[in-house]
Every structure is written in structure tokens, then in C-alpha cells.
Amino acid sequence: MDIPLSSDALDLCFHPAAETNLLAVGLISGKIQLINYDDYLSSPSSSRTPLAPPSKKSKPSTISSAVETPTKLYRKLYTSRPSKKSCRGLHFSTTGSSIFSISKDKSLFSTDTQTGKVVQSWIEVHDAAPSRVLPVDESLVVTGDDDGVVRLWDVRKGGGKGIKPVRMWEHHFDWITDMVYLADLPVPKPKSIKEAKKSKTQLKKQRRRARQAERLKEHDKEKREQNASDTEASEPDSEDDAAIKVESRSRLIVTSGDGSLSSIDLLSSGPTSFEQSEDQEDELLSITSIRSSTKLVVGTQLGILSLWTPSRGLLDHVDRVPGHPASVDTLVTLDNETVLTGSSDGLVRVVQILPSKLLGVIASHNGLPVERMKRKQSVLASIGHTNAVKLTDLSPLLDDNDDQGDDDDEQAGALGIVGLAEDDSDDDDDDDDDDDDDDDEKHLVVELDGAEQTDGDAESGQDDEQDPDSEDVTPSQNKAGKGGFFSDL
């Protein structure tokens, strides 16, 4: 379903509340339109899809009757205009009470969701036109501009003209293309045995640290034994929670047109507050996360999807998925294994990442580039170089096939689509990779304990020679079957 707008759209965002069906759209005229799509969700799924083009053999009466009775499944609540310049980006706050928007005149605005009135404004606070805006929580907002500068704002300090941000990062030299805040980004794993062999001093330091850690554990154990019996039962749980918290971290992941990706710690400042990847020799345009933030998918100008693993560090990608004929300008996560890609050729594709496979096309913008996409539950909203926003029903992809028999469930492949065969080759690869990582960690422990013995090094060297044999995995040759949801591909 296409919702007409007064001018071309530049960005859009869904309301964060699950029971509130609101969509905010930022226009090139500087206006913000708030749209309610309750009727779209309550209508049957058959009426959400566009009508098929009439054939030459169809009668004129049937065509005219279909055109004369259009179904309006949306309501425009209000139109607000914080600035006369174009609205280059907008995003709901974490609670949905306000809408943060950025304009070409280097300003930031906060608009009340209920009334559409501007509550706070930060006038001319950027050196260049801002390109992205992202609220981190109810009081902190992050913006990125065309010069590659990332700024952190505190809403509690109020707005005004020329106000300075709380923190600022200038390690990028080209425009900020996309940002995502991950509260549970995995911590990089320790170095492998091969890297540990390069320096004997590192082994000594690690062995000394291990001894100090054991002493601290023994000291803590003695303290726990002296405490009362009622506190002894609660302390192990608190220790487990602390151990779990150490395994993850909160970071802002930023992609830039300079070909690099960076991880920013918003709670600190200085040169140690961010990590920047190597030059990817291509513009990074979009980013999304899958598998509970253990994998990052980045879209590039050349149409290649690059995969990043935070547990291995964010200095470089670990894999690449080619196949798009044009640039991937926007990305949306569908499930743990699948993403939706919006390309400059006007098509919205369903791409399975693990294993990599093109599942089909679910929407088209008639050859015009897909600039932005957002997804909420079973609704996908996308905009291109037109004065309309397209709503696509994702229920066929997310359907669990509860009404179908067990035979259909057995034949259903990825995303529950009948006719798409499952491919577990990548799962096997991941299991093998995990086994290899576990083997490397075990070898590291063996070498640390036996660093003073010459025989221990010889045994670990033999184990390292056997590791490449365990990494050989036969690639799967499975292909998607015909007759599924995307039978025309």
C-alpha cells in the first residue's frame, strides 16, 4: 500500500510502543507527517497487497469498478514543520513521547508526539548539515553530520542557539551514513595460541595475572566463609550476574562514507573511547545486527554485504556476501538469519545471511532508489525518491504455518516459506569454528601452564598442526526449491 505525501520523503520511523501504530515521516519541505495505520493492520492480508495489473482480455467494467472503490487504510493525524529547511532525519524517543528531527540548517528539534509542537530546539549546533539522528535513552541523543562528526546531546540541559554537545568524536572524515546502538555487544575473545607464541614476555605476564587472579579468588572465598549464612546464598548469584555483565558492552556502531566502521563508548571520551576499523575501500552505507548482536551486516556502495563478528574484534570484516547489482542503501533485520535489503535499483530483497542465499523480492519502488526502510512487527515501511511511503505486509514471511499440516511444516524452509529448503551448512561451519576457538583456548591454557617445560611447547605445536585438518568443511550444494512464496525467481 502506498501512502501519498505532500512532498518527497527523506526519513521515517515507527513508534516504539507495540500497541501504538504510528508512523512519522520527514519530508524534503521540512515538514513532519504523523500517520496512523490501524486500519491497515485490521484489514485482511489480501487487501493489503496491490492489485495485479489487468490483462488485455479483461472487461472495462471490471477494471473501472476496481479503480472506483479504493480502500483507504490510513489516517494522517497532523503535519508539523519545525524548520523551513529539509528534514534530513527523524527518530522517536525511546518512550515515544517526542520526535527528534534534524534539518539542513544544522539544527536539532524535539517535537511532542501528541500535539506536534516543538518542545526544544538546538539551533545551528552543527558545523555541517546533520545526516543521522538516534536517541540512546530518554535523555541522550546522538547525531552525525556530513563532515563525519558524531555528537552526543543531553536533553536535560535544554536547547538554545550554539550550544555545545556533551561529547564529540571526529575520527571520521566523511558523512555519517548509519548508526545503531547495541547495549549487549559481545566482548572480543582473547588472542589465539598462535598470537601468544610470538612473545614469551606476554606468556609470563599472563601467567603472573593468572596467579594474581587465583589469589584474589582465594581471598574472596575466605571472606565469604566469614559472612553470615543468609548472605552466603545470595553472593554466588551476584557473582554470576557480574560475570555475565562482563561478557557484553554497550557501544554505538557508526558507518561512514570514508569506508570505515567505528565502535564508540558513549560513557567515555578521548582517543581510547572509540575503535575504528581498517579502510574497506568502499563506502559503508547501512548497518543492522542479527543473532542477538553477535553478527553485524553492513551494506556497501558496490552492492556487497560485509559480515562483522564483534567477538573477533571490529577491525575488519570476516565474510562478504555479493549478489546485489547496485548499492545497498538500507538494511532491516527480519530474524536471526535473514535481513531485508533496500537497493538503489528500487527492489527490496529478502537475503538469508547464514547461509548466504537470496530468497526473493518483496517490494519494488519502480526503479527508484530505496532510501530508508523501517520494520515494526509484520509491517515494513520504505521510501524512495517519490512523495509516497510504501507499506509492505511481512506476514507471509513471518507466518508459522499454524493452519497447515505437519507435512507442510516439514517442507517449510527458511522463514517458514514452503518450498525453500533449509541449509544447515553454515550452522555446521559455526559449530566447527566454535570448536576451533575452544581448541585454541585449551591449547593456550596448556601452554601457559607448561611454559616452563620444553615438552609442553612441543605438544602444543603438534596440536596446532592438527588444527587446519579440523577446519575442513564440505560446502553444501543445497538450493532453494521452486514453487515457494517467491516462485517467480
Swiss-Prot record:
Keyword Repeat: yes
UniProt-listed Pfam families: WD40
Record region (Disordered): 46-66, 192-246, 417-489
Biased composition (Basic and acidic residues): 211-227
Compositional bias segments (type: Acidic residues): 232-241, 421-440, 449-472
Biased composition (Basic residues): 199-210
Main location: nucleus
InterPro entries: WD40/YVTN_repeat-like_dom_sf (IPR015943), WD40_repeat_CS (IPR019775), WD40_repeat_dom_sf (IPR036322), WD40_rpt (IPR001680), WDR55_POC1 (IPR050505)
Subcellular localization, as worded in the UniProt entry: Nucleus, Nucleolus
WD repeats: 4-45, 124-163, 279-318, 323-363
Keywords: Nucleus, Repeat, WD repeat
Keyword Iron: no
One CC-aspect GO term: nucleolus
Family statement drawn from the similarity comment of this UniProt entry: Belongs to the WD repeat WDR55 family.
Protein name: WD repeat-containing protein JIP5
Lineage of producing organism: Eukaryota, Fungi, Dikarya, Basidiomycota, Ustilaginomycotina
